[in-house]
């Protein structure tokens, strides 16, 4: 064997050793397929539930030589004011996803405890549990995408955290508040209930934030990624009672929010910008209504599901054909065909009116 082949063999052995050194559950892990990771040569991106246009803020550019605060106090205060809670109820995180991970790491013993979630729903609950070595239990939503409370009650053994999403991603519907209340009652003293409200700005009256004062095991996930149009900022929040926030604070990284992110988040939460966000949200909801009506008359579209978020779930005669045809035209949607109970379904982020019109015209041409 010459030196070159010997070097290649040794290199391959090194790679194999690095892989086998990783935890077994990580070796077997199928990572979350984010919209950007799925790629595509898109010109119209409607697959990540992002806001279609970017806000304009100016960085202050100061104190970049210093580590940030453990919790950016101006952001904490501003979000507490916005959400109508005390600063003691707020923890700022790197996006809503970090809040999900923190809660799992804080409350679940690896290989012993489990989380429970209700598919079809957001995929990061399962991925975050798997990376932490925590078991997952699933209780599918009912045919109308509501909680199956009797089955949840039957599967609570060893469950430390229950995740629900309202409005639910990818279906877009709200969970019944009465069901969330029942869930809180059957889990009291047993598990943390996490209500993911990433899309709540599109239906603020449906928030369960009023339940915080009576349920110490309730945690709410929020984000600036959706209605605030700051997905690139990576800024989210956990809202909960002070005892729960204090426990999470033990686990969170010492400097989680970079100074520039905190700067922009504080600007985004000023009353003047909140008013702008609310006005733009109404414009987007108008686009959603237009898109839903336009899709309903297309021969390829069998159903447009009711949505309270910034996206629509549609069922097609041939979802794969529709998805592929639009992909090839640079219109990138989110294929849901492999998701539980969502065969031939596609999720479409509501974009600008021009983008919505192009989606409708493109689907109209699919045979």
UniProtKB/Swiss-Prot annotation:
Keywords: Amino-acid biosynthesis, Aminotransferase, Histidine biosynthesis, Pyridoxal phosphate, Transferase. Belongs to the class-II pyridoxal-phosphate-dependent aminotransferase family. Histidinol-phosphate aminotransferase subfamily. Pathway: Amino-acid biosynthesis; L-histidine biosynthesis; L-histidine from 5-phospho-alpha-D-ribose 1-diphosphate: step 7/9. One of its GO terms (molecular function) is histidinol-phosphate transaminase activity. Disulfide bonds: none annotated. Its cofactor is pyridoxal 5'-phosphate. It is an enzyme of class 2 (transferase). InterPro entries: Aminotrans_II_pyridoxalP_BS (IPR001917), Aminotransferase_I/II_large (IPR004839), HisP_aminotrans (IPR005861), PyrdxlP-dep_Trfase (IPR015424), PyrdxlP-dep_Trfase_major (IPR015421), PyrdxlP-dep_Trfase_small (IPR015422). Homodimer. It catalyses: L-histidinol phosphate + 2-oxoglutarate = 3-(imidazol-4-yl)-2-oxopropyl phosphate + L-glutamate. The modification N6-(pyridoxal phosphate)lysine is found at residue 226. This is Histidinol-phosphate aminotransferase 1. NCBIfam families: hisC. One of its GO terms (biological process) is L-histidine biosynthetic process. The gene is hisC1.
């Amino acid at each position: 064997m010459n030196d070159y082949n010997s070097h290649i063999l040794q290199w391959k052995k090194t790679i194999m050793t690095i892989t086998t050194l990783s935890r077994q559950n990580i070796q077997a892990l199928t990572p979350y397929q984010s919209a950007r990771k799925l790629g595509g040569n898109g010109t119209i991106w409607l697959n990540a539930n992002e806001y279609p246009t970017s806000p304009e803020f100016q960085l202050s550019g100061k104190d970049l030589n210093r580590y940030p605060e453990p919790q950016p106090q101006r952001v904490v205060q501003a979000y507490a004011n916005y959400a109508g809670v005390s600063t003691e109820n707020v923890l700022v995180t790197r996006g809503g996803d970090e809040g999900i991970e923190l809660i799992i790491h804080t409350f679940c013993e690896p290989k012993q405890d489990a989380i429970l979630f209700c598919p079809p729903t957001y995929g990061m609950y399962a991925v975050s549990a798997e990376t932490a070595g925590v078991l997952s239990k699933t209780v599918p939503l009912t045919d109308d995408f509501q909680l199956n409370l009797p089955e949840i009650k039957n599967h609570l053994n060893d469950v430390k955290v229950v995740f629900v999403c309202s409005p639910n991603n990818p279906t877009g519907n709200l969970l019944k508040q009465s069901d969330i209340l029942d869930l809180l009652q059957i889990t009291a003293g047993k598990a943390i209930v996490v209500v993911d409200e990433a899309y709540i700005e599109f239906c603020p009256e449906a928030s369960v934030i009023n339940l915080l004062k009576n349920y110490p095991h309730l945690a709410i996930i929020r984000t600036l990624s959706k209605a605030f149009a700051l997905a690139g900022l990576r800024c989210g929040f956990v809202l909960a009672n002070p005892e729960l926030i204090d426990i999470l604070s033990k686990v969170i990284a010492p400097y989680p929010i970079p100074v520039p992110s905190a700067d922009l988040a504080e600007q985004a939460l000023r009353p003047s910008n909140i008013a702008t966000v609310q006005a733009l949200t109404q414009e987007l909801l108008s686009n959603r209504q237009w898109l839903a009506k336009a899709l309903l008359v297309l021969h390829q579209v069998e159903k447009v599901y009711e949505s309270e978020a910034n996206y629509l779930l549609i069922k097609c005669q041939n979802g794969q054909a529709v998805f592929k045809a639009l992909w090839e035209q640079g219109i990138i949607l989110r294929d849901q065909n492999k998701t539980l109970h969502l065969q031939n379904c596609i999720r479409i982020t509501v974009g600008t009116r021009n983008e919505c019109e192009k989606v409708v015209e493109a689907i109209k041409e699919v045979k």
